[in-house]
Amino acid sequence: MKAAAITPGKKDSLRVIDVDRPRPGAGEVLVRMLEAGVCGTDEELNLGIIGEAPAGSDYLIIGHENLGVVEEAGKDVRAFRKGDLVVATVRRSCPGMCFACRTGQPDMCDSDDYLERGIKGMHGYMAEYYTERPENLIPVPQSLRKVAVLLEPLSIVEKGIEQAFKIQERMIWRPRRALVAGAGPIGLLAALILRDVGLEVSTFATRSRESLKARIAEAAGIEYFNVKETPIEQIAELQGPLDMIVEATGSSEIAFKAIGLTDSNGIVCLTGLSPEQRTHSVCTDCVNQDLVMHNKAVFGTVSSNRVHFERGIDRLTSIERRWPGLLERMFSRRVRLENVKEGLKGDKEDVKVLVEIGA
């Protein structure tokens, strides 16, 4: 079968290879891939910045945003049958089975020994077929066929926003306004979730107000700003007191600014990674004083587990019901598996690129 693979640590090594089609064990499911999403992680893998091949392999099949259909279920599998739509979770428990992993929360793993399909120590989903244990597969209703490939990134934001509301149980909290920094796929999904729970939401990016990102945001009643024209500080002034900020750019500078722009008793959720180790001058006393005197909370979030995927199904359904067809507009480009390298070449209008694998 065909698969998209890299040599970990080697720049621009992405290529399509031929590998044996996997065979499911008695307790496994064989899934035929339909499509995979491309994200910044895949770009970092191809740049050689991150990535770890499975033990005994010199290559890594990439792909973690996925949608497939059950081709065959092992004889001991009862939960799935041929033709079922499924999305697979990504992170797997560490070998030492820390407390978080033992309790079904590998996304909160206490060690760095966890595995991630398509990223760290396990082959991913950008292949014609893969096998998986049924407990790692999420059933998808046919009504979500066109957008379910967004479930994995949405699950990450679903987790972050859920945690924010859980943390804010420290008081009686009635949030009204939220700002999402960044309008990429994670940012747009965060903004849509916050709109879905009833908040007034704004977002910003470097694209114009005529861009696809802006049009998607504004179609859901999310106010969009071009940060090149309206600085983040001015956005906060225009929007009024901000109860919550979701940082989805990966800019540490913006992350620190977000703390100061959040209103008293507010919360900042950090979802963006900052791998470049840049430094900025920050008044650390000012940050500490602001956090303490105004009861602010800041936390980071990464990955997700089965619970967030399952809740994500309900969220996708709700968003589709409220804004029909809006999620599908995020798919700005589609490429075939054999042209996967084209999918990693950025286009100024890209929001989410899909790699089409099967019919």
From Swiss-Prot:
Catalyzed reactions per annotation: D-glucose + NAD(+) = D-glucono-1,5-lactone + NADH + H(+); D-glucose + NADP(+) = D-glucono-1,5-lactone + NADPH + H(+)
Gene3D superfamilies: Medium-chain alcohol dehydrogenases, catalytic domain, NAD(P)-binding Rossmann-like Domain
Keyword Zinc annotated: yes
Domain of life from the UniProt record: Archaea
Binding of substrate, residues: 41, 116, 152
EC number: 1.1.1.47
Keywords: Carbohydrate metabolism, Metal-binding, NAD, NADP, Nucleotide-binding, Oxidoreductase, Zinc
Keyword Signal appears in the UniProt entry: no
Molecular functions (GO terms): D-glucose binding; glucose 1-dehydrogenase (NAD+) activity; glucose 1-dehydrogenase (NADP+) activity; NAD+ binding; NADP+ binding; zinc ion binding
Cofactor field: Zn(2+)
Pfam families documented for this protein: ADH_N (PF08240), Glu_dehyd_C (PF16912)
Binding site for Zn(2+): 39, 64-65, 152
Gene Ontology terms: biological process: non-phosphorylated glucose catabolic process
Residues annotated for NADP(+) binding in this entry: 183-186
Described purpose of this protein according to its UniProt entry: Catalyzes the NAD(P)(+)-dependent oxidation of D-glucose to D-gluconate via gluconolactone. Can utilize both NAD(+) and NADP(+) as electron acceptor. Is involved in the degradation of glucose through a non-phosphorylative variant of the Entner-Doudoroff pathway.
Protein family: Belongs to the zinc-containing alcohol dehydrogenase family. Glucose 1-dehydrogenase subfamily.
HAMAP family: Glucose_DH
Name of the protein this chain belongs to: Glucose 1-dehydrogenase
Source lineage: Archaea, Methanobacteriati, Methanobacteriota, Stenosarchaea group, Methanomicrobia
Gene (name only): gdh
